[in-house]
Amino acid sequence: MAYTIEEEQELTAIKAWWNENYKFIIVCFVIAFGGVFGWNYWQSHQIQKMHKASAEYEQALFNYQKDPKAQAEQFNQFIKNNEKTSYAVLALLDKAKIAVENKDFPLAEDALKQAMAQSNDDILSSVSALRLASVQFQLGQLDPALESLKSVKEQAWNSAKNLLAGDIQLAKGDKETAKKSYQQAQENAGALEQQLIQVRLNNL
């Protein structure tokens, strides 16, 4: 099992957007809630803090990608130090991706459950839930996989969500429900994806 090109592109886009916009987010927060008092100090402190977290994330990921086993403790420490932040969630998604590549699906499942628990962002939560369902499907955990798909709230993932639901339902022997899920997936899919889904429908 591997993540789709669309999933990887979406996660890359999320990372790029965050790196480009986190300063603006901080400014908006201060204007809305901070008032004028302490503006310069608070702005400087938060930007330095975010720069530090970003650099630490990139370094931790670089080291972990080179040798996951040797760097596991340090990578987990980074996640702990940045608990409940987007960087922790992104690190957990990266950890799961590498685990899947190494066919360590239980480790991937654990990382994705942590990502869901730590995420306060609908997009990251949806990505985490979709990937968790994929891993659980790979592990033969069909009912938990369907349950995880309920946490995919972002509409951009509706096609992928329904497609995976159809695959899981088909594995459970429920062809009628699988057919409905595939048809729903087709409604939001691109041209190529529609053709691939039609193949599934034709084989029911």
Curated annotation (Swiss-Prot):
SUPFAM superfamilies: TPR-like
Residues that span the membrane, as ranges: 24-44
Superkingdom of source: Bacteria
Keywords from the named record: Cell inner membrane, Cell membrane, Chaperone, Membrane, Transmembrane, Transmembrane helix
The keyword Transmembrane helix belongs to this UniProt entry's keyword annotation: yes
Main location: membrane
Side of membrane Periplasmic, spans: 45-204
Membrane topology: Single-pass type II membrane protein
PANTHER family (UniProt xref): ANCILLARY SECYEG TRANSLOCON SUBUNIT (PTHR38035:SF1), UPF0070 PROTEIN YFGM (PTHR38035)
UniProt family annotation: Belongs to the YfgM family.
Function: May mediate protein transfer from the SecYEG translocon to the periplasmic chaperone network via its periplasmic C-terminal region.
Subunit structure: Interacts with the SecYEG translocon. Forms a complex with PpiD.
Protein's name in the database: Ancillary SecYEG translocon subunit
